[in-house]
Amino acid sequence: MRHSLAILFCLGTVLVLGGCASAGQQRGLYNNAYVSTSNPAVSISVNGIPWKTGGRSHGYLRNASMVGAPSPDVYTQVFGTDARSPMATITHAVVNDRWYWNDVTPRVGAIDEENVVIGGAGFRAFTYLVPRNNDPFGGVVGDPTDNGPAYWIARYFARVVDFRLGKIILEYREPAPQGMVSLSGNPVGQSGFVSQFEKRAEKAFSLGTPGSVGQITNSRPADIRWAFMRDEFLGDCTENQPDFNDD
């Protein structure tokens, strides 16, 4: 009985989220927005920053709870022009039903963790300095390295979707002010910069529902460092355990 009720609950939730996956499901760039036609049905666009590159490949999770860590399907789009200007990314990572995404947790050194709402959807957000050595988007629009070591400052927004099989990550970046090497001890006067940066980040993305979508083609863009599309950026997963008490 409990198993039957669980099935009915899942079916009802899927209908609310936009219907079951089918052969017609598409995910990728359409009209300069990332579109997923189901699970969930969503359209995400970046405001005021031109599209640079994007496509589909796989992530590499190393810290999953069990042996045989998953290699999620990763759809990602990058928006930006150069390392002196803002940059934004949209990432949708999907695991198979052997796994589920854990709750969103901040990266080491992150600050200002909070819940925010973008386009009516709830996200967990935090701000951090991007380490260039393992940045999956390093070099796509260049790196802010003028006048010595420098970093991107990033505002990271993430939410789990589709019964925790999917995770949507929105990230907005700007070149960090020169001399900013840590967010826990900002030089005097830079706390105001961080606050204003976070406000700009929240306005960078628009969410909606996809309308009629034409054919989407996904390639594997070579300029994204897929080997670093790992736990540090994507987050971690846990393996589903069988319920031996289920009737």
Sequence positions of predicted segments:
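Intrinsically disordered, low-complexity segments enriched in polar/charged residues with Gly/Pro
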Residues: R2, L29-N31, D146
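Generic marker of residues within folded, mature protein domains
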Residues: C10, P40, V160-D162
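N-terminal targeting sequences that direct proteins away from the cytosol to non-cytosolic compartments
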Residues: C20-Y75, V181-D247
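Conserved polar/disulfide-associated segments of primarily extracytoplasmic proteins
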Residues: H58-I169, P175-N186
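Bacterial N-terminal signal peptides
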Residues: L8-G18
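Polar low-complexity intrinsically disordered regions enriched in Ser/Thr and small residues
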Residues: L15, S22, A83, D112, ...
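Bacterial N-terminal signal peptides that target proteins for export
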Residues: M1-F9
